[in-house]
From Swiss-Prot:
It comes from the Eukaryota. It is an enzyme of class 1 (oxidoreductase). On the 2D-gel the determined pI of this protein is: 4.27, its MW is: 54.49 kDa. Belongs to the multicopper oxidase family. Lignin degradation and detoxification of lignin-derived products. Its main location: secreted. Its EC number is 1.10.3.2. This is Laccase-1b. Keywords: Copper, Lignin degradation, Metal-binding, Oxidoreductase, Secreted. The keyword Metal-binding applies. Cu cation binds at H9.
Length: 9
């Protein structure tokens, strides 16, 4: 994804 938090899943 674009946001770092979105990729933490």
């Amino acid at each position: 994804a674009i946001g770092p938090v979105a990729d933490l899943h």
